[in-house]
Amino acid sequence: MAKTDPLTLQQLLAQRHWENPALTQLNRLPAHTPLASWRNADAARGDLASPSQRLLDGEWGFSYFDRPQAVPDAWINGDLPQVGRLSVPSNWQLSGYDAPIYTNVQYPIPTDPPRVPDDNPTGCYSLTFHCQPAWLQSGQTRIIFDGVNSAFYLWCNGEFIGYSQDSRLPAEFDLSQRLLEGENRIAVMVLRWCDGSYLEDQDMWRMSGIFRSVSLLHKPHVRLDDIHIDTRLSPEYRSAQLRVLALCSLTDASAYQLKVTLWRDDTLIAQHQQPFGTPVVDERGRYLDRTRLSLQIDQPLLWNAETPHLYRAVIALLDADGTLIEAEACDVGFRQVEVSGGLLKLNGKALLIRGTNRHEHHPDRGQVMDEPAMIADILLMKQHNFNAVRCSHYPNHPLWYRLCDRYGLYVVDEANIETHGMQPMNRLADDPSWFSAFSERVTRMVQRDRNHACIIIWSLGNESGHGSTHDALYGWIKSDDPSRPVQYEGGGADTAASDIICPMYARVDRDQPFEAVPKWSIKKWIALPEETRPLILCEYAHAMGNSLGGFSRYWQAFRQYPPLQGGFVWDWADQNLTRQAADGSSWQAYGGDFGDMPNDRQFCMNGLVFADRSPHPALFEAKRAQQFFQFQLENTSPITLGITSEYLFRHSDNERLCWRIEHHGEQVAGGQITLNLPPEGTVSLMLGELPSLAGELWLRVEVIQPAATAWSPANHRVAWDGWQLPAALSLPKPDVPGEQPRLHPQSQLIEVVQAGQRWQFCRQSGELIQWLQADKPQLLSPLRDLFVRAPLDNDIGISEANRIDPHAWAERWQRAGYYRLESQLLRLQTDILNDGVQIRSEQAWLADGEPRFLSRKCYRINRQGEMLLEVEVDIAAGLPEPARIGLHCQLAEVAEEVCWLGLGPHENYPDRRLAAEFSRWQLPLGALSTPYVFPCENGLRGGTRELTFGHWHIRGDFHFSLSRHSVEQLRKTSHRHLLRDEAGCWLTLDGFHMGVGGDDSWSPSVDEEFLLRARQYRYRLILTRG
């Protein structure tokens, strides 16, 4: 270690290392792949705990200051009187110090690089520990910080050790010359902001502290410093080479050898041993401190996300007598990644990326992710047909990659670089003074993670424009690791710094011709002249709140056009944080809820799953669209089903097809067939004859996995589909004789009476204001037209209280007066018919005295006690398309169960219903609402033919929702925990409902076919006593 002058704390801080982009570290050791220094080769092979490692996680001393200069010099040598305790790893903001800040683009500090505010929150950590005596006698003892945000200084026993920044990569220091017998004390001063913060402008919560593990590692004096693993496959993929490069600290290269053994479980596959030194490199000779060797492997089991076969390589450093000095080990997956023929290929097969972006986020622990949380994410991804994850937007915890290797996920490893808030975005990427800061974040990532089979693409970072620095770093990666492609979206997604066209939020068919960086439709992009690269969307389908509409269109395009090789949904999990209320209850917070300024409100909640990893309904849509089995109904007489496997590498040796025919939602036929399909195989199966039944006749199929797997339980469902079958001709049912309804006009209302039922209509509004069954009122509010919804995030767009987006749906509806409509009755007419009573009304809905909608209703109450309701709605010209054409009312009864025949079981909307199935469903009332943290329209079920709830039974072809919360309350409430159950239950019955959109959430993204563009709509319902 370079000797450092004994500066006082204030003298050291006066140098302001944290504002110098050319200086990113002092005394930090070079980056390398993870090491464990086993002293037993069998322990290395078994991945047992290494006695050379010691974890320092736990309770540390902690003192908080508003700026580094406020820290007393005495703290370096001993804890201060007011010292507290803080868990490591953690973010200090979640323990009551300072506040987390959520912003997307805008920097949370004034934009003045490389300077940061003088008021720079500072956390002072300390820990005392005893060091093993043997470690003091020989060798090297290192301390490793896996993640510290954003910069820190380190002291050991009062002596300055070093400085580091880059929150997401390890910082490693040599403590050997500073450790003492007995008690040792390390002190770590962490700064919230540094010049590196300008490179970490990711869309996430800005939090600080030691948020990943801290450990000690003892290495012998002669030691392995780094191991590079590379696998090469033969052209026919039947044999492979395992190439190993070992870098060592040696006193005499001739006295040491390297031995590599490759294992498959307990079976030795290959081994090789050779002395150190390389062939001559140039006119100055060769390397003496490194060696390269190669093992030939015949018929290797290849790694891929479907069958993630792994071997274990043990790299042993031996002395001249063959005695083990130390061993390192790592998992090895034999696979080959390439871009050839315009396609991204793995082991010769063109991949279809079923991907998601994932932040390291936990609602209670912030940016601290432990192994159970990581495994839970991986299992959920695999269970929902994801095969890839992009580490957005920084290198993840080192354990994440080992788990992805073992469970099978393709990974895009991304450098911790984003300068989204700069103007222009590429300002720092084109500034030579920042080159070193950029470079270390890319090169150190590659040096740490290169041995992982799961990593198939390197990424130069996110949303940082395109500058000369990107071109240089692209070249460095291609030279240092030619085994993987490189991608980078900045500067237009198709610059020379990317092997893959990797746009974000490009539409399927619509161009977005932005100045300088046009975003073409994905179909057009791959057809551009001279473009030969594959296209993989680095971000698409912005899953913010009630979203993901139109997702299936992307997958139709991916399957139709081979160069469109999938993409990564934005994003995996909502990034809200848990807060405690005064009464001890907890609630979920988003931007601004900690008093953080600036903030971007709920824009942190874009997940397919809630922060606690319970699913959004959109997750099921993604699972269905991405499923690995495709079905085609080839014939209905007899019923013949075609099945195609989209697995590229695995046989369907654990799959069973289950099929059933349902009549009005009840099974009338079914069966099971074991599937045995080769990769990419197809089969046609005859299921049986078509039943001769009238009415709703549906075929439903699903593929399950009978046996549990590493990532799923037994009988896990992997794919499904359904079709309406041709039904026999049905004859009208003869009317059942019943009591003739009677009309009872009154001064304020019109009442119709029939066999214990009474319907009451208001003479002033023409609306049904009460329905009594056996004298029991059913309504707490009239059955009334409804044209609005509580705005979705996609409806709000980029509108804020002080910045209105005039194109956002919510603003257009607001300007048109849809949320403040007043009713005017134009006509009310009653008629006595041969088989009942008819009431006709014509009602205008006005805003500012101007008509917006004209609603004509015909209520026909017959002898069977049914109310046939026909609704016709006209929309005034020149107005925005409404969210819905429907009815709503407040029911008096709150029944426990809801039963319906229609699409379900989960929430679905016209442009997000691929995953919904037609059947007869029954759920508790509370299960019908989706608890989005930011309240909005939710819980709709479409394609409904029948609905039964309490004493209500409704037939027709409609959408419905049932909720304890009105549209008005949802619209005006900022957080889920602030919603209050209202009296009764709100029922909405929609004849028509617009889509939710979801290509992005800042521009109108509902496809034309899912907008209510017609000027007139008609629908029909039948309401009867349940």
Curated annotation (Swiss-Prot):
Assigned GO CC terms: beta-galactosidase complex
Binding-site residues, substrate: 104, 203, 463, 539-542, 606, 1002
Keyword Metal-binding carried by entry: yes
Pfam families (UniProt xref): Bgal_small_N, Glyco_hydro_2, Glyco_hydro_2_C, Glyco_hydro_2_N, LacZ_4
Binding residues for Na(+): 203, 603, 606
Cofactor(s) it depends on: Mg(2+); Na(+)
Gene Ontology biological-process entries: lactose catabolic process
Reactions catalysed according to its record: Hydrolysis of terminal non-reducing beta-D-galactose residues in beta-D-galactosides
Active site, renumbered: 463 (proton donor), 539 (nucleophile)
Residues that hold Mg(2+) 1 according to the record: 418, 420, 463
Keyword annotations from UniProtKB, A to Z: Glycosidase, Hydrolase, Magnesium, Metal-binding, Sodium
Family the UniProt entry places it in: Belongs to the glycosyl hydrolase 2 family.
NCBIfam families (alphabetical): PRK09525.1
Name of this chain's protein: Beta-galactosidase
Gene name linked to the record: lacZ
